[in-house]
Structures are given as C-alpha cells and as structure tokens.
C-alpha cells in the first residue's frame, strides 16, 4: 500500500495551479462518500515515482492531509501532452 503526504490547497483556479506546477507540485482532488470534496496539492516527483507502478491504479492508497489519513483510489490522471509531467489527479474515497 502506498502513502502520500498532501497539503490542503489554499488557492484555486488556473493561476494558482500554474504556480503549483512551477513549484514542482500539482493539484488534485478527493471526492466521494458523504464528505465534501477536498482540494489538495501533491509533490510531483514523489507521486511520479509511485504512479509508475501498476498497483497505484488498482490498490487503495492512503493520503495523509493535516495528520488525517484518507483511504482513496486513483480515479483519473491527467498528464502533460508531451512532457513526462502529471497535471492533475482525481481520487475517490474508498
């Protein structure tokens, strides 16, 4: 099982997402269940290494946000058209 550390996003929108990507991070969202959707930011290099394994897409992952563990599955992964970069990931609560 994989564990990913995340932070709650302070800003949202196109400009904020671009600033995140310039800082070697990228936006993601956790939704599903009875809780409200949670916008988070992830470290690009750490997630890039983890997502290279097939288990990332099939197993339940643990995302730690502010010390709270959330069990999720990867729902959708958006990649840059020609660079080896992640743009955004949707996670659904497991």
Curated annotation (Swiss-Prot):
GO cellular component, one term: cytosolic large ribosomal subunit
Source taxon at top rank: Bacteria
InterPro entries in alphabetical order: Rbsml_bL25/Gln-tRNA_synth_N, Ribosomal_bL25/Gln-tRNA_synth, Ribosomal_bL25_short, Ribosomal_L25_dom, Ribosomal_uL5_bac-type
Disulfide bond sites: none
GO biological process: translation
Molecular function via GO: 5S rRNA binding; structural constituent of ribosome
Keyword Cell inner membrane among UniProt keywords: no
Keyword vocabulary terms for this entry: Ribonucleoprotein, Ribosomal protein, RNA-binding, rRNA-binding
Keyword field contains DNA repair: no
HAMAP family recorded: Ribosomal_bL25
Subunit structure: Part of the 50S ribosomal subunit; part of the 5S rRNA/L5/L18/L25 subcomplex. Contacts the 5S rRNA. Binds to the 5S rRNA independently of L5 and L18.
Biological function: This is one of the proteins that binds to the 5S RNA in the ribosome where it forms part of the central protuberance.
NCBIfam families: PRK05943.1
Family the entry assigns: Belongs to the bacterial ribosomal protein bL25 family.
Name under which the protein is recorded: Large ribosomal subunit protein bL25
Organism of origin: Escherichia coli O157:H7
Taxonomic lineage from the root: Bacteria, Pseudomonadati, Pseudomonadota, Gammaproteobacteria, Enterobacterales
């Amino acid at each position: 099982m994989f564990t990913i550390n995340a932070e709650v996003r302070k800003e949202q929108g196109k400009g904020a997402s671009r600033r995140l990507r310039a800082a070697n991070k990228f936006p993601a969202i956790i939704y599903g269940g009875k809780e409200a959707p949670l916008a988070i930011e992830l470290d690009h290099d750490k997630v890039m290494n983890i997502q290279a394994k097939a288990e990332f897409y099939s197993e339940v992952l643990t995302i730690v946000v502010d010390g709270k563990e959330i069990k999720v599955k990867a729902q959708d992964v958006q990649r840059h058209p020609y660079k080896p970069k992640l743009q955004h990931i949707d996670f659904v609560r497991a």
